[in-house]
């Protein structure tokens, strides 16, 4: 290369890096220390997603990381209960594959629709006769039930309701179609995410921050501290 020339580099942002970790007040990071204060276990996961790289971060990887984090916490803080705090990202709120999803159902029984778990008709059901009763989400022949069957078993009259609105339901409506009506039932609304189930079954607590309030997220404080430290170092 001749003097004064520089190599032409590929355009782009370079390789992506994704870092997922848990922070706590006592240690800064969730780690397990030995007698000398050296880190022997940690919950941090680093991936390099993208073309020819690692798979993108998803719920499966998150759940595996949480399992590891719980084991580390139990070793580092025996006889203590952890409170895990998450924001409202889609991975954090992911439901299990057999979750109740009204808009994934057909109007009639069978057809191409996934099988959903059985449920209990909620105490808030409009018709008190069916409150608290178990409800199977499959027919006797093993086919997934459709919207109409599930609603009629709860005492609703669906004769004048369409299956689903197109393209979307009116924002303020709660009973514009069968799917919207069923989706507003308490057992469909109040479902537990896979993250929360994993944590509570291990004897710990889980808290999800309200949407659109990032100022409540402890990670924002960590990010601000890092930026302040970096700016101070650059100003020296």
Go through each PLM region and give its residues.
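Short functional hotspots at interaction and active-site rims
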Residues: 1-236
């Amino acid at each position: 290369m001749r003097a004064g020339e520089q190599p032409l580099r590929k355009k782009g942002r370079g390789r992506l890096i994704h870092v997922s970790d848990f922070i706590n007040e006592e240690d800064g990071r969730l780690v397990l220390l030995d007698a000398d204060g050296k880190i022997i276990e940690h919950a941090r996961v680093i991936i390099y997603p993208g073309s020819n790289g690692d798979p993108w971060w998803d719920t499966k990887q998150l759940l595996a990381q949480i399992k590891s984090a719980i084991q580390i916490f139990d070793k580092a803080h025996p006889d203590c209960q952890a409170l895990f705090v998450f924001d409202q990202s889609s991975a954090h709120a992911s439901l299990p594959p057999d979750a109740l999803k009204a808009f994934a159902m057909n109007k009639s029984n069978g057809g191409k629709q996934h099988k959903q778990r059985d449920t209990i008709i909620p105490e808030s059901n409009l018709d008190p006769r069916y409150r608290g009763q178990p409800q199977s989400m499959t027919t006797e022949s093993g086919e997934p039930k459709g919207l109409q069957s599930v609603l009629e078993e709860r005492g609703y009259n669906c004769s004048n309701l369409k299956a689903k609105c197109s393209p979307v339901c009116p924002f303020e409506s709660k009973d514009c179609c069968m799917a919207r009506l069923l989706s507003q039932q308490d057992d469909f609304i109040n479902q537990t995410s896979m993250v929360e189930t994993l944590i509570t079954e291990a004897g710990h607590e889980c808290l999800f921050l309200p949407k659109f309030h990032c100022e409540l997220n402890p990670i924002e404080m960590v990010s601000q501290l890092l930026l302040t430290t970096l700016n101070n170092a650059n100003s020296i």
